[in-house]
From Swiss-Prot:
Catalytic activity, EC: 2.1.1.242
Organism encoding this protein: Psychrobacter cryohalolentis (strain ATCC BAA-1226 / DSM 17306 / VKM B-2378 / K5)
Keywords: Cytoplasm, Methyltransferase, rRNA processing, S-adenosyl-L-methionine, Transferase
Entry GO terms, CC: cytoplasm
Predominant cellular place of this UniProt entry's protein: cytoplasm
Protein name stated in the entry: Ribosomal RNA small subunit methyltransferase J
Catalysed reaction equations from the record: guanosine(1516) in 16S rRNA + S-adenosyl-L-methionine = N(2)-methylguanosine(1516) in 16S rRNA + S-adenosyl-L-homocysteine + H(+)
């Protein structure tokens, strides 16, 4: 099985399996999207005539030495991870996005966004939390360090932009393939040159050990879904030093927000320690997750 944590530190040679000859134009569109956004992905496309049932997908996950993307018979692009096809699947969040508000979404209670807010989701992942943030009318910049994930996000944004009910929300999302620290440094330099754009909220959902959802005393806790399992293949949890650098850099960005109070919101499993061992200004939690707010 491919060690993605090593592969994704350089240009990625990625196998794309598609199941119908008529999808050749979509393969070309994917190549163009990769070039447009300068993603370090080398896409090796292959037409597959055999049926990719669950057993065959599991076999491919075990024997193939590079990441696999699958363009299925419904023209949906997914990543084959441990035999499971995973994709952002934003359309499945429609009911949640439509009804999102501070009463139903703990994240929005913590972020306290308005329609004119500027937000950075510095660890976008599959983009589900970005949708909730953007449902308020806020502009959300989504940072995703892993090129493979960034490609899935860009494809999903294009797909959802064809649906009338989603077009306004999609227009409020900007997806960038970069790591948070590099972007924060560039942004602070941008502000330092006299530019006035300011960020109201930075949202962080860093990787954490797979057992972090469990209470260390009882062993009980929330189950980890397939999307989270897939993300654990892409990234290591940050070290304490890396956590400190990430939190400090985020705080530096939101501190340049004029007279308004900026805030950094950090998502943690309910039983996980605070990011960088720094006590938050305030926390919001339920039985599974906790949102720690750092006010600047």
């Amino acid at each position: 099985m491919t060690n993605l944590k090593q592969v994704l530190t350089a240009d990625i040679s990625c196998q794309l399996l598609y199941v119908n000859e008529t999808q050749a134009s979509q393969v070309e569109s994917l190549q163009a999207l990769i070039a447009k956004h300068k993603l370090p992905i080398i896409l090796n496309a292959e037409l597959v005539t055999e049926k990719l049932n669950q057993k065959r997908r599991q076999q491919l996950s075990q024997i193939v030495t590079q990441p696999i993307l699958l363009l299925d018979e419904k023209d949906k692009l997914s990543w084959l991870s441990e035999g499971l096809s995973v994709a952002p699947e934003w359309d499945k969040l429609q009911r949640r996005v439509v009804s999102a508000g501070r009463k139903s979404e703990l994240l929005l209670q913590a972020a306290k966004l308005t329609a004119d807010s500027e937000v950075i989701d510095a660890t976008a992942g599959f983009g589900h939390d970005s949708l909730i943030l953007a449902s308020t009318g806020a502009q959300v910049t989504m940072l995703e360090q892993q090129p493979l994930m960034a490609l899935l996000l860009l494809v999903e944004q294009l797909r959802m932009s064809t649906l009338p009910n989603w077009q306004k929300l999609m227009s409020r999302l900007q997806i960038i393939n970069t790591d948070a620290l590099t972007y924060f440094a560039r942004f602070n330099n941008y502000l330092g040159n006299g530019n006035e754009q300011a960020i109201d909220v930075i949202y962080l959902d860093p990787m954490f050990p797979e057992d972090s959802y469990q209470d260390s005393k009882t062993g009980k806790g929330a189950k980890v879904g397939k999307h989270m399992q897939a993300l654990h293949q892409l990234a290591h949890p940050p070290t304490l030093d890396e956590e400190q650098q990430l939190l400090q850099s985020a705080q530096a960005v939101v501190s340049q927000n004029g007279q308004k109070q900026g805030r950094v919101i950090v998502k943690r499993p309910q039983f996980a320690p605070s990011l960088a061992d720094q006590q938050p200004s305030e926390s919001w939690n339920n039985e599974a997750v906790r949102f720690d707010g750092y006010f600047v």
